[in-house]
């Protein structure tokens, strides 16, 4: 019972940790020391913090804890991608993915156990929704991955956070399970820790929040913690996006694009990334490309085309590679900066849209999906 009542320091940002230490009469520099031990050195025991006074360490041990989520499984892909399944209790589990590349190491972090947005092409959405993650559970994914990856690479650091080009985890994308902006109050302290020089010290350009288009929270993020922004677009018209991304019925394209333009005033990059999952016969025709060009010209953006990663419940197919290339070329010919995402980790179900974890659904999403009677292929561009 005592352990459950102790404060988990893992999810406290710098201000909250300073407030806590201040309640005990401690100086702000003590909070910074503590933060460096936890997030830069990966300490999970107060006894290891030898430059802190013994009495202070004793007080910490009595009233606080450093506790990440239990790891159920780890899988490794043939391409080097790694996926961890974290137990979040009551029969639920979330997934976190590390994607190594020559010039970076990207960690894909989850924000919810499941997702209530229920996008048609996303395995997480088909699992339904159980609960939001806490800030400790969000940042704990980075804390764990950093410890494990640096230990494996033999590069664990005893000093500062390093620079973005030398650390094992150089980029974080909030593109795992869940809609981050529907868990804003827990997301915000986690983002602040990612950016804090006494924690992970990542630049704002290297932390990306992906959203399906929660317009009010996009505005709040631009004020509170403007990091790079990616928007799950996936359709160039409201009619089609209503079917693919049901949140569009609440925040249609005109509102979403206006919010993107507002966000750019504070963004660390001079463009918004639009994510577009390529679905065979659904959103990949010449007509869709022409409509998408008109959308893209309204906001400074980059288009990221994502080959669909099939899963049984979707009833959808991946666009053929040749069609994806033609689609991308039409966008580029129109002057739209366009990339095609390379599929990584699909042999361990770690690719984009495949994360499902284990979710005890509280939203009866399967029943709602069964009630959809309009074949999506009939929706016109």
Curated annotation (Swiss-Prot):
User: Which GO molecular function entries does the Swiss-Prot or TrEMBL record give?
Assistant: 4 iron, 4 sulfur cluster binding; metal ion binding; rRNA (adenine(2503)-C2-)-methyltransferase activity; rRNA binding; tRNA (adenine(37)-C2)-methyltransferase activity; tRNA binding
- Write out the entry's keywords from A to Z: 4Fe-4S, Cytoplasm, Disulfide bond, Iron, Iron-sulfur, Metal-binding, Methyltransferase, rRNA processing, S-adenosyl-L-methionine, Transferase, tRNA processing
Residues involved in S-adenosyl-L-methionine binding: 178-179, 210, 232-234, 309
Report the family membership: Belongs to the radical SAM superfamily. RlmN family.
Q: Where does [4Fe-4S] cluster bind?
A: 115, 119, 122
Q: Name one GO biological process term.
A: tRNA methylation
Q: Cite the Pfam families for this sequence.
A: Radical_SAM (PF04055), RlmN_N (PF21016)
Return the HAMAP family for the record. RNA_methyltr_RlmN
Note on cofactor = Binds 1 [4Fe-4S] cluster. The cluster is coordinated with 3 cysteines and an exchangeable S-adenosyl-L-methionine.
Q: State the species of origin.
A: Bordetella petrii (strain ATCC BAA-461 / DSM 12804 / CCUG 43448)
Further notes on this entry?
A: Reaction proceeds by a ping-pong mechanism involving intermediate methylation of a conserved cysteine residue.
Q: Which Gene3D superfamilies does the entry link to? A: 1.10.150.530, Aldolase class I (3.20.20.70)
Role summary: Specifically methylates position 2 of adenine 2503 in 23S rRNA and position 2 of adenine 37 in tRNAs. m2A2503 modification seems to play a crucial role in the proofreading step occurring at the peptidyl transferase center and thus would serve to optimize ribosomal fidelity.
Q: Which domain of life is it from?
A: Bacteria
Per the record's keyword annotation, is Cell division included, yes or no?
A: no
CDD domains, alphabetized: Radical_SAM (cd01335)
Name the chain's protein: Dual-specificity RNA methyltransferase RlmN
Coiled-coil region list: none
Per UniProt, residues of the Radical SAM core domain are: 101-347
Q: Which cofactor does it need?
A: [4Fe-4S] cluster
């Amino acid at each position: 019972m005592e352990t459950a009542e102790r404060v988990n320091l893992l999810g406290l940002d710098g201000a909250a940790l300073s407030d806590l230490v201040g309640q005990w009469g401690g100086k702000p520099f003590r909070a910074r020391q503590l933060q460096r031990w936890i997030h830069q050195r990966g300490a999970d025991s107060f006894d290891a913090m030898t430059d802190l006074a013994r009495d202070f360490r004793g007080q910490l041990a009595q009233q606080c804890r450093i506790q990440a989520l239990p790891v159920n499984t780890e899988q490794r892909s043939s391409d080097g991608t790694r996926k961890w399944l974290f137990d979040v209790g009551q029969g639920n589990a979330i997934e976190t993915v590390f994607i190594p590349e020559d010039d970076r190491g990207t960690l894909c972090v989850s924000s919810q156990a499941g997702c209530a947005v229920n996008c048609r092409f996303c395995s997480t959405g088909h699992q339904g929704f159980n609960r939001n993650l806490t800030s400790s559970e969000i940042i704990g994914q980075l804390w764990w991955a950093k410890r494990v990856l640096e230990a494996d690479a033999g590069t664990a650091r005893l000093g500062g956070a390093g620079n973005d080009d030398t650390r094992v985890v150089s980029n974080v994308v909030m593109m795992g399970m869940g809609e981050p902006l529907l868990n804003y109050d827990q997301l915000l302290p986690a983002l602040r820790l990612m950016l804090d020089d006494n924690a992970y010290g990542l630049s704002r350009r290297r932390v990306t929040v992906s959203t399906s288009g929660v317009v009010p929270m996009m505005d709040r993020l631009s004020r509170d913690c403007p990091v790079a922004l990616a928007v799950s677009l996936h359709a160039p018209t409201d009619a089609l996006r209503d079917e693919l991304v049901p949140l569009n019925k609440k925040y249609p394209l005109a509102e979403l694009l206006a919010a993107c333009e507002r966000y750019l005033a504070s963004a660390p990059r001079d463009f918004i990334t639009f994510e577009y999952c390529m679905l065979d016969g659904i959103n990949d025709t010449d007509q869709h490309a022409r409509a998408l060009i008109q959308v893209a010209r309204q906001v400074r953006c980059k288009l990221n085309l994502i080959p669909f990663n099939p899963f049984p419940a979707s009833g959808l197919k991946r666009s053929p590679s040749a069609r994806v290339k033609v689609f991308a070329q039409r966008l580029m010919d129109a002057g739209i900066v366009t990339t095609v995402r390379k599929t990584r980790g699909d042999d361990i179900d770690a690719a984009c849209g495949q994360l499902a974890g284990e979710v005890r659904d509280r939203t009866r999403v399967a029943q709602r999906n069964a009630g959809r009677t309009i074949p999506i292929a009939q929706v016109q561009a």
